[in-house]
From Swiss-Prot:
Transmembrane stretches, start-end: none
Gene for this chain: sucC2
Residues involved in Mg(2+) binding: 187, 201
Function in brief: Succinyl-CoA synthetase functions in the citric acid cycle (TCA), coupling the hydrolysis of succinyl-CoA to the synthesis of either ATP or GTP and thus represents the only step of substrate-level phosphorylation in the TCA. The beta subunit provides nucleotide specificity of the enzyme and binds the substrate succinate, while the binding sites for coenzyme A and phosphate are found in the alpha subunit.
GO molecular function, one term: magnesium ion binding
Keywords noted in UniProt: ATP-binding, Ligase, Magnesium, Metal-binding, Nucleotide-binding, Tricarboxylic acid cycle
Record's keyword annotation contains Nucleotide-binding: yes
Entry protein name: Succinate--CoA ligase [ADP-forming] subunit beta 2
InterPro entries xrefs: ATP-grasp, ATP-grasp_succ-CoA_synth-type, ATP_grasp_subdomain_1, Succ-CoA_synthase_bsu_CS, SUCC_ACL_C, Succ_CoA_ligase-like_bsu, Succinyl-CoA_synth-like
């Protein structure tokens, strides 16, 4: 589960990481009062669990309380990548001298964690890595030993961070361990004109498998019950939200994982993992497609099924049902092979939906889904 920025900063504060004074509100009038309490000037930030807030106009610097009220009024109710802004956070501005990036993230390949750090913060770390890969340090962290001062010094040296960041690196690791997080990120971590190290923005992703020992977040999970993961879980679906734009549905974890890799190899990013399992019914397929299509980040959907216990005609029937229940506005690429594949293809041909295409191979289906997602993203940016 992802936390909102204001929740992440409260965790940082609890663990001794310096953050600016800030307060959350859903009222423009209250925003004026908060700005006044902060000294007049304030950064007004949309609180949504997605990126791209700044580019969407969801972050504004207000020079006085009146501007803060106006900014809050503008931001509240905005739609940012399909997320409605219900609250804003007003934070005290900082005089920034330098910006850095630091994070700890679970590395599933090694079974440990990675410290990722850069002396070039304040922008998407992927952009920095693509432009100057040598500017991003990746240091493996053994979870058995963790991050103490010596390890933090090594991370800071590798990334070119100043010595003052070492204490924050140690404390950020404590946030990850004590809160059972899969990711803790500060971007930017800044050095102010006064020489203070301050976490201006943060992201924390909690491990849902550890919820039994993190009761403090139970209420937050309840408030977030309309999330895609919660909706999928209520339908008994094995769904994991990812950060891409191509929705992926398959039968069997191995096939779905392979499909994710092929999509990535085609230059796109998977938006999710969704395994409908063996013996899935038409109802399960329809439910899965409904969840994936409701993700605002999804630009195209790839259904990749090898029929065994799960018959391809049942999958096709589920797709047809979903088309009758949900207004399809995103292109759907379907690859069926195996048990009753010919029948399944015939069902989809008979439905003849203009946004549904079929492919005969996994590679071909992934390439087509990736191209459609790229085209949709480009059209959206142009619009």
């Amino acid at each position: 589960m992802d936390l909102y920025e204001h929740q992440a900063r409260e965790l940082f504060k609890e663990h001794g990481i310096v953050v600016p004074r800030a307060e959350v509100t859903d009222s423009p009038e209250r925003a004026r009062e908060i700005a006044r309490a902060l000294g007049g000037r304030a950064v007004v930030k949309a609180q949504v669990k997605t990126g791209g807030r700044g580019k969407a106009g969801g972050v504004r610097l207000a020079a006085d309380p009146a501007e803060a009220e106006e900014a809050a009024r503008h931001i509240l109710g905005m739609d940012i990548r399909g997320h409605t802004v219900d609250t804003v956070m007003l934070a005290e501005p900082c005089e920034i001298e330098r910006e850095f990036y630091v994070s700890y993230v679970l590395d599933r390949a090694s079974g440990g964690f990675l410290a990722i750090a850069s002396a070039e913060g304040g922008t998407e770390i992927e952009e920095v890595a693509a432009r100057r890969p040598e500017a991003v340090a990746r240091i493996p962290v053994d979870p058995a030993t963790g991050v103490h001062t010596a390890t933090a010094v090594r991370i800071a040296d590798a990334a070119g961070l100043p010595p003052q960041t070492v204490d924050t690196l140690v404390r950020l690791w404590k946030v990850l361990v004590r809160e059972d997080a899969l990711l803790v990120e500060v971007n930017p971590l800044v050095r102010t004109a006064e020489g203070r190290i301050v976490a201006l923005d943060g992201k924390v992703t909690l491990d849902d498998n550890a919820r039994f020992r993190q009761s403090r977040w139970g209420e937050t999970r309840q408030e977030d019950a309309d999330s895609l993961e919660a909706r999928a879980g209520a339908k008994g679906l094995n769904y994991v939200k990812l950060d891409g734009e191509v929705g992926v549905i398959g039968n069997g974890a191995g096939l779905v994982m392979s499909t994710l890799d092929v999509v990535a190899g085609c230059g796109a990013r998977p938006a999710n993992f969704l395994d409908i399992g063996g013996g899935a019914s038409a109802r399960v397929m329809a439910d899965g497609l409904s969840v994936v299509l409701s993700d605002p980040d999804v630009r195209s959907v790839l259904v990749n099924v090898f029929g065994g216990i799960t018959a391809c005609d049942a999958v096709a029937d589920g797709i047809v049902r979903a088309l009758d229940e949900v207004r399809l506005t995103k292109p759907l690429v379907v690859r069926l092979d195996g048990n009753n594949a010919a029948r399944g293809r015939a069902l989809l041909d008979a439905r003849a939906h203009p946004l549904v295409e079929q492919a005969t191979t996994m590679d071909g289906a992934a390439r087509r889904a990736a191209r459609l997602a790229t085209a949709a993203s480009t059209a959206g940016q142009a619009g």
